[in-house]
Amino acid sequence: MAADKKAQKNTATKQIDPEQKEKALAAALAQIEKQFGKGSIMRLGDTQALDIEAVSTGSIGLDAALGIGGLPMGRIVEIYGPESSGKTTLTLSVIAQAQRIGKTCAFIDAEHALDPVYARKLGVDIDALLISQPDNGEQALEICDALVRSGAVDVIIVDSVAALTPKAEIEGDMGDSYMGLQARLMSQALRKLTANIKATNCLVVFINQIRMKIGVMFGNPETTTGGNALKFYASVRLDIRRSGVVKDGDEVVGSETKVKIVKNKVAPPFREVQFDIMYGEGIARMNELLILAEANGFIQKAGAWFSYNGTKIGQGKNNAIKWLKENPEVAEKIEQEIRNLLILTPDQPASEKLELDVNDESDFDEAFEEQE
């Protein structure tokens, strides 16, 4: 017994030669790569993993708040909120921006409610958009998995998680209980999807609805449908709400929309952004561009006049926006300068940014107060 204790003590105190340790590690890495393929394990610093490709949301402020210039490719994103808050509008805007840079997009319409006329108005090329209207949740997720594994589709929208009804529930009778069936379906599907999404660099966006938890006395009673799996697998979660209305005289022409980044694995989370969604037009890009350009000094305002590079471009907000629409080259140049200022690069710490902090709502609130 004493000899065994002495042997254990000698083993514990024995120092491992660093050179031998490095050789052992190299051998283990080589064995893993041989068994599972090249790239199955690597040092984080040896890759460009942090330089994540992004697709613009169509909102400059939201792109800046997301930290990388939009929604990350090769990841799962969840967008949720109350009814008529702008969830589908935001995802159609993402599709329009993705198509503009040559990406192939698909829309899995589980709600059977996509309006092609509205999608076209938002800039979506509906002739190039792939659309599926599945009969049940299993079919929708199988189609999604097949599109991801093909490697030929870059952006997939699933609208919505709440409409992914399990086949057993559809074939059953009204009033039958199917406790946890949809949650199990989502959990199984996401386990299958995650690795393929990363391998094919495909962006999959799930739209989700809000439900109320019964009997919650303290804290937020709201929850999303489909169980907890999506919360864990999503790299980005956006909470979108309608915060007010946009009026032209007495007529309501749009809605003020607030988006909170509830979760973000690719940049700092918990930022909030506000922008307008105009009915029949989508996100009011030029309105947002003018606000951000003024806040960051690219456009100056003196009294009611706006000026750019010393040249007056319009008296009042509406005239300045009209000038930006009539001069798309200048608007694009200003937008690129704003993006360069506000959006983090992979090697740049967040502390080095920025004159306008998108997490600080005061700049946005002041700007929108001026509009009113």
UniProtKB/Swiss-Prot annotation:
The gene is recA. One of its GO terms (biological process) is SOS response. This is Protein RecA. One of its GO terms (molecular function) is damaged DNA binding. It comes from the Bacteria. Keywords: ATP-binding, Cytoplasm, DNA damage, DNA recombination, DNA repair, DNA-binding, Nucleotide-binding, SOS response. Pfam families: RecA, RecA_C. The keyword DNA repair applies. Belongs to the RecA family. InterPro entries: AAA+_ATPase, DNA_recomb/repair_RecA, DNA_recomb/repair_RecA_CS, P-loop_NTPase, RecA-like_C, RecA-like_N, RecA_ATP-bd, RecA_C_sf. SMART domains: AAA. It comes from Haemophilus ducreyi (strain 35000HP / ATCC 700724).
